[in-house]
Amino acid sequence: MESGVKRMSAYKIIALVILVILAILFAFPLYWIVTGAFKTQASINATTPEWFPSVWVLDNFKKLFSRQMAPLWEFAVPFSSHFSSTGEDIIFSAGPMVPAAIRWLVNTVFMAVAAMVLTCITASMAGYALAKKRFNGRALLFSLIVCAMALPKQVILIPLLREMSTLSLYNTLWAVIVPTVGWPFGVFLMKQFSEGIPGELMESARIDGASEIKTFTNIVIPMIKPGIGALAIFTFINSWNDYFMQLIMLSSTSKLTISLGIAKLQAENSTDFGLIMAGATLAAIPIIVIFIAFQKYFTQGITMGAVKG
């Protein structure tokens, strides 16, 4: 018995050591980027790596915020690009001038938050309907959604690009937001959570005279809240880091996101790694904040989703 306990303790210690090593390996790139943002160019390009900055400087952030200026926001006349001689939207209101990096950050936050909110709303409704409603073709529809999860974005790029152009959404942030709203993974995740809602609870709500909307908002939403929290994090990070779609759908300088802006910082003949690391550090802050804010729901969502799946 005692040997068995010692053997289990040894396994736990080995597992803990492996997990710590993996955590260090995953966290090291973030550490290197953040510390690199505060290093001098000479320290970054040194032959011997400098694991910890000997001198902390803000020169990279000063360069990042002094490269060029842009309005904090712009409100354009809808569909005005069709009537403009330059093909650009006609701006009727613009915010104060700020560093371009701040504008990139504002564009990305708006895009990611809008995609997160709209995806959580549509996915929770669709998942609930697929889990609790009986209608013809339900199984076929869910099978198509699962199949859509396996399709890479490159497969639907041309139809999606033509659709956004037809809807006059091309070269707007909505061209990146709208395709995310129908994210198949979100519908799949919400269906898994909705299946765990007791049917008796919903039946009693109908007997009490609750409408479909009231049943959904007062019963379904509170019970799938952990799943919504997990989906919110997934959607926010997916939209924030979706460099490919942003590169294809956005062409104007005023529509640049933080990912496109960082890529633009690379010069043709030389690369200022300190400047790029400063931009990457700025881009990582909102993701870290969102993860910390939704960490409880994210952990619950992953655990409960795994059990229900």
Where are these regions (language model features)?
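Juxtamembrane low-complexity tails/linkers enriched in Ser/Thr-Pro and polybasic
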Residues: M1-G4
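A structural signal for multi-pass alpha-helical bundles of membrane permease subunits
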Residues: K6-R7, Y11-G309
